[in-house]
Structure formats: C-alpha cells, structure tokens
Amino acid sequence: MRGGESGKIFYGWWIVVAAFLNFFFVIGIIFYGFPVFYTSFVEELGFTHAQVTQGFFLGFLIVGLPFGLVAGAVIDRVGAKWVILTGVALVGTSLLLMARMTKLWQYEALCVLEVLGYVFAGPIATQVLVARWFRARRGRAMGIAYLGLGSGGVVAPMLINYLIRAHGWEHALEIVAIALLVVLFPVGIWVTRSTPEEMGLLPDGATGSAATGVAIADTASSRVAEAVRTKNFWLILFGSTLAIGAIGAVIQHFILFLKDQGYSSAVAARFSTGLLVASLAGRILVGYAVDLVSKKNAMAVFYFLIGASVVLLMAARVPTAAWAFAAIFGFSMGADYMLVSLVTAECFGTSSLGKLLALIIMGYSLGQWGFPWVVGKIFDARHSYDLAWKLTAVAGMAGGLAIYLVSARKEKARLS
C-alpha cells in the first residue's frame, strides 16, 4: 500500500476509505436498507407494492436519465469530489423531508430528489474516483471500496428495523439522514481529491519508468463516440441492465415477499441481513481475485448465478430454501456493480470513463428501478410473485450470457 520511493502510504488508499464510506451510506444503507421502510408505507400510508417502488422508477425517468448523463460530463470536467458532495446533500435532504410525508405524491416527489442525489453521489462518481487513482491495483482498490456497499447492506436491515420499532419510521428516516450527512460531508471536504494529479501524484503512486507506463497505457483510452459503436459497449450495457435489474427486483421486494410468505418483519430482516452478509463474502473474493482472473468471465459467471438462484424463491415458504437463496444470490451479488466499471475500463481505458459509465449506469438503472416496479405491478395484479420471479431469473441468466460474449482485449486493440 506504499507508493513511490518515499515509503509513505499512497494517498490513493485514503481515497479508497472515502469511497468505502460513500458506498456504505449512499448504496449500502440507503439502497439496501430502504426497502425495510416499505412495510410501514404499505401498512400506515396505504401504498401498494407497485407504488412503493414506482417513486424511484419515476425518479430515474424524470431526473436519473438526463442528469446521469450530465453527471458523467461534469465528473470529467470538474472532478468527482464536488459531484459527490452535491449528491450527499440531496440524498440527506430528501430523507429528512420524507419523514414528514403523508401523501403518495409527496413520496414520489421526494423519491425523485433522492434519485438525483443517488446519481451524483452513487456509483458513477465513486467508481470514477477510484479508477482515476489506481491502475495496476485498480481491482483490489475497487474491491475494498465496494466492501463499504456490502458492509452497509449487512448493517442496514436489522438496524433500520430496530429504529422503526424503537422510534417509528419517521424518526428512523431522520436518524439515517443525519448520520449520512454528519459522516460524508466532512470526508468529502477534507479527504476526497478527484485525481492524483491534484496532489502531484500519479495512479498507484507510480514514479520514474512506472509513471511512463501509466502515461502510455492511458493513450489507448477510447473516445466515447468510438466506444458506443462497438459490440462490447452494448453487451456490457445489455448484460448489466438485465442482471442488475434482477438484483433490484429482488432487493426492493425481498422483505415484502417474505412477509407475504408468512414471515414476520424481524425474521424477514434477518433473511435480508443474511443475504447481504453473503454478498460481503462475494465482494471479498472478487476484490482479492479480480486482478488475477478474467474480469469479464468472472462477471458473466456471477451474473448467471444471480438469475439461476432466483428459482429458489419459488420454495421460499421453506426456511431452508429461503436461506439457500440468500446465500447463493447474496454471494453472486459480489460482482454486481464493481465489475461493470472494471470491465468498461479494461475495454475502453479511463480518460472518458466518466462519460461511458454514465451511459452504462443510466442504462442499467432502467433495470435497477424499472424491474422492481414491474414486479410490483405483477404482484398487485396477480397477488403472487411467482411469474415475476420466473421473469427475473431469465433476465439474470441472459445478462450473464451477454457479458460472456464481451471480447475485451480484441475490442480495445482494434480501437487503440
């Protein structure tokens, strides 16, 4: 972890700590923990299963897609630091206001605001931030950062369930919002730096001949216009949209589904926690091994397993089947977002990574927020999740196949 010849710890590892905390709160706590609130929204505010997820889908359609594309360009122009800080402010504000909502339209409006914050503070800016600071050790650095996502996810269900029982869902939202703002604002202001060049450094802390290698490697970065005309770009976009859509469908409905299967809120939260503990194990494995194996093949295998494991939900009334699903699906989630940025960087370089990731993430966000809404509509119409889970399983496996067809080295060589 030491860089250059000075023996000092390379500052990029402090960037990894900042990214870890960002993933912990913005994705781990908010994305994976927020579905715990859905039961309260359904029981106390009268929302349907589709309505509790359609707010985020509307947010994606209204602001996520257009502002996501803008976020990528802004990151490349002004740096990830200020984009992340803006997003943190928006997410925190939306949660504080959500604690006062009483109507569906208020919920939907605040979901739009939260999605905008997620776009700025979430995967796009954080992945670009880490990718700019590392090259040779990019996979390991990204893996450590993504442990924040898994760690937040592990903590979130049980913690939020406790806060709701102890203080009510309104105060629980306020507590989560304040914690997010108190931690991420100081870290963003005093720790985060958008690029190593701001501190007179190079990726990985490289010096001398190693620095020359870094410079030469980045000259191979593909222009955005060239990249979007390649088969690889569309395979990554299509595959990640399907697989991450499957993840979103399960995560957003898992607790509601388990309640429908006869489990209590506390037991459902334990299953959700178990799933996310398994995802943490998957992230540790991927983070350790990703620089040693084919990134796109690893991504394909994990995505295929995501889809295949959903079949177990058909027998979820049996606790053993529910735990088996949580273990396999959770472990397979270890490659969900992280490998998207690594495979994209491997195919196209990093000079325009912000713009390319914005395009890809906005694409898979259609699945991430759209699939849960579709699953909710199916449940509201049929009063059963069976058809929804069958479609989700097919989507995940098809996503894995698409990623397997990516030919990273050949495509990059042709574009360079």
Please identify what each model-predicted range represents.
Residues 14-40, 44-49, 157, 250-255:
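Extracytoplasmic
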Residues 24, 94, 105-121, 241, ...:
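Hydrophobic core of transmembrane alpha-helices in multi-pass small-molecule transporters
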Residues 30-39, 225-288, 371, 375:
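Extracytoplasmic gate region of multi-pass secondary transporters
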Residues 41, 120-134, 335-348:
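Intracellular juxtamembrane helix-capping segments at the cytosolic ends
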Residues 57-72, 273-285:
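Central cavity-lining transmembrane alpha-helices of secondary-active solute carriers
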Residues 66-79, 283-294, 379-380:
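Helix-to-loop junctions at the C-terminal end of transmembrane segments
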Residues 82-96, 297-311:
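Structural signature of the two symmetry-related core transmembrane helices
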Residues 149-196:
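Helix-loop-helix hairpin linking two adjacent transmembrane segments in secondary transporters
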